[in-house]
């Protein structure tokens, strides 16, 4: 059987954005169809059109991204700025003085302009996901825009990050969406792992250049979304075929070939991703590297993540989120060895079995203990003093770790006792939300 993915988080770790009230979006359909207004903060120059574009893009990026009108508005604004820039360049050859006083738009557009333009074009594909031709058209245009930007800004790290993001997002929307379990690599159907390798290579190029030039500020919330998109992609690959098999549970039970139906042949376009752990390992290695680069920013600012500040730097919640994702990835990796240990140790039906999943009882115990301890280290760094759920994540990991020791041993009791203290605190802070977990621990 194909190995299961243990490291990635996918949508389970992705923070869910709350939907806004739809009523506010339809109050004035005339204005909505013809205007886009963005509230600029005090730092944005109202006379700087590129700054206004950045503000519009930032508003979109932090939203649910479900408004095609906004995306089209961004693209139209990019078109206008590009036309003005090209006009200024043409005028420069005829009248340099005239070009220098042209106020319609900047003469040379910055790298992030091309990044915004390309990402907006790629986002349009989300609104036309059922039309493969349009999806291809939007991604082709997005990648062309990035490449044009790289011609103007050779080696731009920001544009390299953008290109890797677009290439990763392209894979599920343009390629995986057209596949079935029976699909094979042939004319017009590429190996998806080769597409993914190309995207990850570009990400690594951007990552290495940013580190070499000490541009650690590029390791921010926006670029963390690249790793999240990659993680979501791995989850899609893991679950590929299951959606088509969903239905009457009785049918599944009667169908002895059910598991075989969702296995992929070696000729399947997704086989090269599903049947290896290298992509899961890549995700975690580069997420840890991302964390280290965030720490470089904090060190430069003289800020310790352990320090409690009245006004918290924006990098600190970002750091906690990264630590949470890494910690949860170790928890997921621990699932199989910990299950092997408890089965071999406590299940009488396996009394004569020496190994499961290639692991003995002692091996599975040691591996599980290491993984849970590592997860616990990261989850402690992810703790938010204002968020009880983060405390509970720590407590539950302590309970799982305690379960891997001998019954009533000192190690087990220590983990259980500490977990109970944390759960009691969280339960009191949430008016009894964690009462069931606490009671199970105490019985």
Swiss-Prot record:
Record localization: Nucleus
Swiss-Prot/TrEMBL keywords: Nucleus, Transcription, Transcription regulation, Translation regulation
Feature: compositional bias, Basic residues: 1-18
Pfam families registered for this protein in UniProt: Nro1
Keyword Nucleus: yes
Primary localization class, coarse: nucleus
Region span, Disordered: 1-44, 86-107, 241-261
Gene Ontology BP annotations: positive regulation of SREBP signaling pathway; regulation of translation
Presence of the UniProt keyword Ion transport in the record: no
InterPro entries in alphabetical order: Nro1/ETT1
Biased composition range(s): Acidic residues: 246-261
Gene Ontology terms: cellular component: nucleus
Family from the record: Belongs to the ETT1 family.
Function as written in the Swiss-Prot or TrEMBL entry: Required for correct translation termination and probably involved in regulation of hypoxic gene expression.
Protein name: Enhancer of translation termination 1
């Amino acid at each position: 059987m194909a190995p299961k993915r243990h490291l990635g988080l996918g949508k389970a770790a992705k923070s869910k954005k709350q939907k806004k009230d739809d009523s506010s979006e339809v109050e004035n359909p005339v204005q909505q169809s013809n205007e886009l207004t963005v509230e600029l903060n005090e730092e944005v120059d109202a006379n700087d059109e590129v700054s206004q574009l950045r503000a519009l893009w930032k508003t979109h990026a932090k939203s649910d991204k479900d408004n095609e009108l906004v995306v089209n508005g961004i693209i139209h604004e990019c078109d206008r700025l590009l036309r003005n820039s090209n006009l200024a360049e043409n005028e420069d050859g005829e009248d340099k003085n005239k070009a220098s006083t042209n106020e319609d738009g900047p003469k040379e557009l910055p790298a992030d302009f091309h990044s915004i333009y390309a990402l907006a074009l790629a986002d349009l594909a989300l609104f036309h996901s059922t039309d493969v031709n349009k999806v291809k058209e939007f991604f082709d245009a997005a990648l062309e825009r990035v490449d044009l930007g790289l011609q103007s800004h050779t080696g731009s790290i920001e544009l390299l990050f953008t290109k890797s993001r677009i290439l990763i997002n392209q894979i599920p929307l343009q390629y995986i969406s057209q596949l079935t379990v029976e699909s094979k690599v042939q004319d017009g159907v590429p190996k998806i792992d080769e597409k993914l390798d190309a995207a990850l290579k570009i990400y690594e190029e951007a990552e290495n250049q940013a580190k070499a030039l000490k541009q650690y500020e590029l390791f921010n919330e926006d670029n963390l979304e690249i790793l999240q998109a990659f993680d979501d992609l791995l989850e899609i690959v893991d679950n590929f075929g299951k959606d088509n098999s969903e239905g009457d549970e009785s049918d599944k039970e009667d169908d002895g070939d059910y598991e075989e139906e969702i296995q992929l042949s070696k000729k399947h376009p997704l086989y090269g991703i599903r049947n290896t752990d290298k992509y899961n390992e890549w995700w975690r290695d580069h997420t840890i590297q991302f964390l280290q680069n965030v720490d470089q920013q904090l060190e430069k600012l003289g800020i310790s993540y352990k320090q409690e500040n009245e006004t918290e730097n924006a990098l600190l919640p970002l750091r906690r989120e990264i630590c949470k994702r890494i910690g949860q990835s170790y928890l997921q990796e621990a699932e199989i060895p910990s299950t092997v240990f408890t089965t071999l140790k406590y299940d009488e039906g396996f009394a004569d079995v020496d190994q499961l999943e290639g692991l003995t009882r002692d091996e599975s115990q040691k591996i599980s203990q290491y993984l849970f301890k590592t997860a616990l280290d990261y989850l402690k760094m992810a703790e938010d003093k204002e968020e009880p759920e983060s405390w509970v994540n720590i407590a539950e990991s302590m309970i799982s770790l305690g379960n891997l020791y001998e019954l009533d041993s000192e190690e087990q009791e220590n983990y259980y006792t500490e977990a109970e203290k944390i759960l009691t605190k969280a339960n009191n802070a949430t008016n009894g939300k964690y009462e069931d977990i606490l009671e199970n621990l105490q019985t």
